[in-house]
């Protein structure tokens, strides 16, 4: 309850500060709309179904992209953590892919995957992959060597040691990567939509900004993205609390 109360207080302070800026600075609506203007535009967007339509598309992209990227990242991270040879072979490619801006790669991936949902999921998965893979690798290598030696002496093979020791030991670090990855999934979905999509919150932002000159609608789309990001981050934190033994 204390956390919820603190969050509500910080939200209230943010909204009040936002309102003061618009009043004191005499900001025109097309530059910085007042909170009540954005709220009213949000109600209209929800009532007309526009927000639901675009948010639904983005949600699907985030869920599929995060699931694909996180699954592949965890498996790759385990392999990297257990084998120095695998790390030496794969690390240059992983780092190189991460070093290239996703905005530059997105149009190319859109072409390779033929556009559509598959392309956007691939872009989202790529941006999610790196932090989770690295976190998993670090976590796997943090397993207690004494416990590992004890399991070896009891006849446990590599797979059993991974299941009983390395993965449980790595979970706190893996979940740290998942927290970062799930927020990056939201960014990845928007970037993917900018690369080529007919709907989604990223598309709605472009329509509001460039087509309709509707700044309040753009703020509504941004707020929806923030809420989605917070919700998914909260789910990861909840899963962490249930699965990680402190």
Annotate the PLM regions.
Residues 2-26:
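N-terminal signal-anchor transmembrane alpha helix
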Residues 23-67, 207:
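Periplasmic/extracellular loop-to-transmembrane helix junction in inner-membrane transport proteins
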Residues 64-94, 111:
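Transmembrane-helix boundary motif in ABC transporter permease subunits
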Residues 84, 141, 172, 219-246:
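C-terminal transmembrane helix and the adjacent membrane-cytosol boundary/short C-terminal tail
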Residues 95-131, 138-139:
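Generic hydrophobic transmembrane alpha-helix motif, especially the helices
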Residues 111, 140, 187-225, 244:
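Glycine-rich helix-loop "coupling/hinge" segments at transmembrane-helix boundaries
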Residues 122-126, 159-192:
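Transmembrane alpha-helices
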Residues 140-146, 150-170, 211:
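Short helix-to-coil transition segments within interhelical loops
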């Amino acid at each position: 309850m204390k956390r919820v109360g603190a969050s509500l207080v910080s939200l209230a302070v943010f909204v009040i500060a936002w309102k003061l800026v618009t009043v004191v600075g005499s900001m025109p609506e097309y530059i910085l709309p007042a909170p009540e203007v954005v709220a009213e535009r949000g109600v209209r967007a929800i009532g007309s179904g526009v927000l639901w339509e675009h948010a639904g598309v983005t949600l699907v992209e985030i869920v599929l992209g995060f699931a694909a990227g996180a699954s592949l990242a965890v498996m790759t991270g385990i392999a990297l953590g257990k084998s120095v040879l695998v790390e030496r072979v794969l690390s240059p490619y992983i780092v190189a892919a991460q070093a290239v801006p996703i905005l530059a790669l997105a149009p190319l991936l859109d072409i390779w995957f033929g556009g559509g949902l598959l392309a956007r999921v691939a872009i989202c998965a790529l941006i999610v992959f790196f932090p989770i893979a690295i976190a998993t690798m670090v976590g796997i290598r943090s397993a207690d060597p004494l416990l590992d030696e004890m399991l070896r002496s009891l006849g446990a093979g590599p797979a059993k040691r991974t299941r009983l020791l390395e993965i449980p030991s790595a979970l706190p670090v893996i979940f740290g990567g998942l927290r970062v990855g799930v927020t990056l999934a939201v960014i990845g979905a928007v970037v993917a939509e900018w690369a080529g999509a007919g709907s989604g919150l990223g598309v709605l932002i472009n329509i509001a900004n460039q087509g309709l000159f509707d700044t309040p609608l753009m703020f509504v789309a941004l707020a929806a993205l923030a809420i989605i990001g917070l919700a998914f981050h909260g789910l990861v934190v909840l899963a962490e609390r249930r699965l990680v033994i402190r």
